Curated annotation (Swiss-Prot):
Protein name: von Willebrand factor A domain-containing protein 3A
UniProt source species: Rattus norvegicus
VWFA domain ranges (all copies): 484-681
Location of region: Disordered: 1-22, 711-737
InterPro entries named among the record's database cross-references: VWF_A, vWFA_dom_sf
SUPFAM superfamilies: vWA-like
Superkingdom classification of source: Eukaryota
Bias type Basic and acidic residues, positions: 1-17
PANTHER family attached to this UniProt entry: VON WILLEBRAND FACTOR A DOMAIN-CONTAINING PROTEIN 3A (PTHR46478:SF1)
Amino acid sequence: MKKHRWSMDRNTDRDPQKQLNQKTMNDVTQNSQDGLLVTHVNQTQDLLRLQRSETQTSALEDSEDWLAMHSLKFEKLTLADLISQGTVELEDQNNAVPKVHFTTQTIYHFTSRLSDTIELYQQRMRWLTENSKKAFGLIKGSRVGLLIDSSQVSSGPQTEEFQNDLTSLIDEQLSLKEKLYVLTFGGTTNFLWPDPVEVSASTLQELKLWVKTLQPEGSSNLLQALKKVLARKELNSLVAILRSCPDQPSEFLSDFIQQSTLGRSLFIHIVTYKCDDHVPSAILKNLTDALGGHYHCYSPESELYTSRDVDELLAETHKAQGLFSQLQALCHNNPCEELSCMIEEISTEIAKGPFTSLLPKPPKHEAPLTIKFPDLDKTSAEWLKINGLKAKKLGLYQVLAPNAFNPVEEFVPILQKTVGATIHEKAMVQFEWHDGTVKNIHVDPPVLFEYQKQLGKAVQIYEKRLQWLSLTSRRFWGTVCQRRVVILLDVSVTNSMFIIHIQHSLRLLLEEQLSNKDYFNIIAFGSTVESWRPEMVAVSHDNLQRAWRWALGLQCQGSRNVLGALRKAIEVDFKDKTKHESQGIYLFTGGVPDQDVHILSAYVAEACGGCDLQLNVCLFYVGEPQMNTTPPACYASRTDTAAAYKEVTQAACGRFHWFGETGIYESDDSNAIVSEIEKALNYSQKCAFLVASLKNHSGKELLTAALQKDKPRTLQQSQPKKLYPPKPTAPSVARMV
């Protein structure tokens, strides 16, 4: 049988760089009559360089429409296009359902074109994820205003790396623009030129030298920088490179930009460069979405990489993979063995290379683990037993108890009735107790003020705990506390675009939280279940490294057989679960399971009952599936998915952890700390209420005393004087006349 080679090296003339060289050579030939007489090889090289620069400039300007001009739909490589090339036949006159038949040549030609298109996507992906485009994205526009955040620029290797990346951006992208306007901002703004300048060799050199002198300065006053750059009406592109969260709220910045750009065609491009905190990424992404611009996040240390161009290209490549699966199904019904082998060979190559090799990876993603030995972490519930308000004797009722008195009522024989004790309102306030009763509290303001200070210190400790829970591997997994641990990894086909994220999350866990455990195992599941080892093995440096190398070879396929993975873990790895303590299963998944939630809940409730075994769910949200992609086997909204897994964790007495690209959405560990903070704030408010009530009573007493003192004088002054009748007098001489 003759075997065709359909490798990804076919049709190399579609390489953008080779196309560019070929086009340039053709242009040289065509332009040789336009006064460009080449007499030396150096002149040819200069001319090629000039032509290449002009072509690259055009490519940068038209890149927004690149995918539209090379999409599967535009290239007529969709399933509908394939069906339109087939012939409809009725095999049985009694059967009204027609069947579509394809010739070998039709499928052969369609598959060849699809393979070429995927190769082109590969080349485009490499181009988008190299050099300055990886760090800052693809800068659009010809007259660019560049804002550089200098608030977090610090000395050391980080500064040098940032300056080198900026220099690369200047050489590769900004050098192809027409005009530039550059300023830095921190507490104040500093501009290189008072007005936009024409791009030339001298201005670019001046800019590169200026970048080397960047110094840290205060906070991140983005609004002040925007006011200056948006006043330059000649600019058609605004690029902001930030390394920290802006001082102003995103809603305020969005309103200001929209009002300032009303009636203008201005492209907004916001970059977060190595922002270690997830909060700036969330704020700036929402800001860019509201403005209809492009957001680019580059933070390899935190495993954050977001690019709209890359995401759209990956989605189109994913559709091509789905189409190949459909072609494979066609070949099973095709009698041509040669064609079936050809399709199988191409699909195998695609499954191996185009996706995981093109996905952006953190630095040293495939390097050996750097294993740390941490302390044995506790869940927040256990941690609060030692550091909570009650454990620290900072409960409000604990503090007030020595000065709290029950109301006293006794029968007075001489009065022949029951009389209640009088409250001394100058020092006591009636206060509702935690059991609903009312007690008389002796209020001592200095004691309560000191108590509020202690509450403030406790809240600071809780806030540090919250921040600690949101960093490194705990952001993805929470705290892994048990001594015997099994990790379940969701590698269903819907997670194909996120396999690097899944692997990186596992890497952080292996490095930071598993080295102090006793036994562990890793189970990957899609439609089928595959485990790293048949059963749990002892934790060692070598075993952790071997587990990581195994995880690097994982491929996403099939649906989401959660029940199968749970059964493998519980019935094989934890078959002796009643003989051991401190055992945990950590399910790392991105969507709703294949099985009904009630079935899962009933199974884990029975399996985890009567032993020290917990199921903890780590749910990562990857967004809603695209309407034009292959639908998942089971679908539920993000809220329904979260509710389903919360029900499962509650049945297994475990913890629920839900996160996404913008941070942690919900976590039982974090919720426990937040609840303790809210309790401390509530206690502080009640202290303030007690002091205010005491002051209010004292103020009323003083006012009453003053009124009583002034009352007689006021009444005396207000009474009208009594008028007496005039005394009788004798008639005057005038009246007698």
